Amino acid sequence: METVLGMTAIAVALLIGMGALGTAIGFGLLGGKFLEGAARQPEMAPMLQVKMFIVAGLLDAVTMIGVGIALFMLFTNPLGAML
């Protein structure tokens, strides 16, 4: 029983940690490319900004889905039925 709970805790930590890391990398790339595009064509900056915010929202959604799955695994422990 302790092994299953321990492995579940490790899986939850990896899921949340990797989701946060991926989001941070994604936001860094997104912001950098937005600044490059706005510097190259300043007249396109408002349109690029709208698209950047849409993609930023999708990046956050992926992380929140990962957190939801992690909390589901943590509190319901679907692997507990294997015991």
Swiss-Prot record:
Task: From the Swiss-Prot or TrEMBL record, state where the protein is found.
Answer: Cell inner membrane
Q: Which GO terms describe its cellular component?
A: plasma membrane; proton-transporting ATP synthase complex; proton-transporting two-sector ATPase complex, proton-transporting domain
Question: What keywords are annotated for this sequence in UniProt?
Answer: ATP synthesis, Cell inner membrane, Cell membrane, CF(0), Hydrogen ion transport, Ion transport, Lipid-binding, Membrane, Transmembrane, Transmembrane helix, Transport
Please indicate which residues carry the site annotation Reversibly protonated during proton transport: D60
Signal peptide stretch: none
* MF-aspect GO terms: lipid binding; proton-transporting ATP synthase activity, rotational mechanism
Membrane topology term reads:
Multi-pass membrane protein
Q: Which residues cross the membrane?
A: 10-30, 52-72
Record function comment: F(1)F(0) ATP synthase produces ATP from ADP in the presence of a proton or sodium gradient. F-type ATPases consist of two structural domains, F(1) containing the extramembraneous catalytic core and F(0) containing the membrane proton channel, linked together by a central stalk and a peripheral stalk. During catalysis, ATP synthesis in the catalytic domain of F(1) is coupled via a rotary mechanism of the central stalk subunits to proton translocation. Key component of the F(0) channel; it plays a direct role in translocation across the membrane. A homomeric c-ring of between 10-14 subunits forms the central stalk rotor element with the F(1) delta and epsilon subunits.
Quaternary organization: F-type ATPases have 2 components, F(1) - the catalytic core - and F(0) - the membrane proton channel. F(1) has five subunits: alpha(3), beta(3), gamma(1), delta(1), epsilon(1). F(0) has three main subunits: a(1), b(2) and c(10-14). The alpha and beta chains form an alternating ring which encloses part of the gamma chain. F(1) is attached to F(0) by a central stalk formed by the gamma and epsilon chains, while a peripheral stalk is formed by the delta and b chains.
Which HAMAP family does UniProt cross-reference here?
ATP_synth_c_bact
Give the family, as the similarity comment puts it: Belongs to the ATPase C chain family.
Q: What is this protein called?
A: ATP synthase subunit c
Organism ancestry:
Bacteria, Pseudomonadati, Pseudomonadota, Gammaproteobacteria, Alteromonadales
